[in-house]
Amino acid sequence: MSRPRRFSEVSGFVLAGGASRRMGFDKARLPLGSESMVGRQIRLLRAICRSVSIIGPPDRFPDAGIQVYEDEIAGKGPLGGIHTGLRRARTEFSLFLSCDMPLMDAGFLRYLCEQALVSRASATVPPPWAKGVYPLCAVLRRRVLSTVRSSLTLGQNQVGRFFKKVQRRTISKAEFARAGFSPRIFYNANTPEEYQKVRRQLEALHNRTRVGELGAFPVSSGERSGRT
């Protein structure tokens, strides 16, 4: 059997610079089985991207084994992390993934990259879910860097607002469903209760190969509000 494709045109970045206020401690380093939340995202991206880096404080990830970039513009949230990643990327396309979506499916990330390379859109994004909030998972081209920078300068730090400014390919909900994916992959673990729920499910089903086989999860507060 041939190995799944790795995209030489795509750099991968894990966004892990959040303050984790609702969790109460650093959620990126919370354990999920034999790996951490950030470690799981690194593993997914390594199977898909040419290179993988973390955007976050280097002192929080001394044993990451990959490059860790501090936010070049502090206090701007995920969009600030995207700015740093685009400036550091050595490829035309960059895949950004939040550290706090522990049910993410590598198959969907690969699908997102495929659609980005076919469409050549400035941004290729998942469908917006509850209250129109976009999951923090997207493929962006280097040419959007100027738009990111101007948004940050204007204090417009919301990722969803930025998406609406650029030419984008949005995966529709119908297309998402036809491709066999579940919205469960966008579940955010932002509180201790949400984390424990995910941890129990993953530990109970550690032999399953697809996250899509997991049971139902409610929409988390993070999906409703877009906060981290």
Briefly describe each language-model feature range.
Residues 3-156, 161-183, 199-206:
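Nucleotide and nucleotide-moiety/phosphate-recognizing core
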Residues 1-11, 118, 192-228:
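SAM-dependent methyltransferases
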